[in-house]
Regions:
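Nucleotide-activated chemistry modules centered on ATP-dependent adenylation/adenylyltransferase
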Residues: 1-139
């Protein structure tokens, strides 16, 4: 971990990425020195973290699409594991598009900045904005 010396913080991108790799192979990250791993919440926290990175146009590691591919390959085995429900979002996400993360609208509204940021969370507003800017809706 880059954030905490001598242990894993379980909250930085490197920890999330390593836990995701471990989870993608069907293992429990607690067995690999990630003491704060939660079968119920870690996948959701990971998704929200990456959503904010994408929203702020911050670069994340190029490994995420490979992790997603590995999850798809192991999906049948992973569906049996207790963390699958909080982790299955990774199969559908486009890591460059914050809106593909499937983050619930109420969470997006709570964390959006300003009225324009809140309005931009609604699909109809994005379509209106695209029409105003001359962007084709079918793109």
């Amino acid at each position: 971990c880059w954030e905490v010396q001598g242990q894993n913080c379980c909250k930085c991108e490197k920890c999330y990425r390593t836990m995701a790799n471990i989870m993608a192979e069907g293992e429990n990250p607690k067995r690999f020195n990630f003491p704060l791993f939660s079968e119920k919440n870690t996948g959701i926290q990971m998704r929200n973290y990456l959503y904010h990175k994408a929203l702020d146009k911050e670069k994340v590691s190029d490994n995420w699409p490979f992790i997603s591919k590995r999850v798809l390959e192991n999906r049948d085995k992973l569906k049996e594991l207790p963390y699958w429900d909080s982790f299955k979002w990774i199969c559908k996400v486009n890591f460059a598009d914050p809106y593909s993360f499937g983050v619930p609208l109420n969470y997006r509204l709570k964390h959006a900045k300003g009225i324009r940021g809140k309005l931009s969370q609604f699909k109809f507003y994005r379509k209106l904005h695209d029409m105003k800017c001359g962007i084709s809706i079918n793109d």
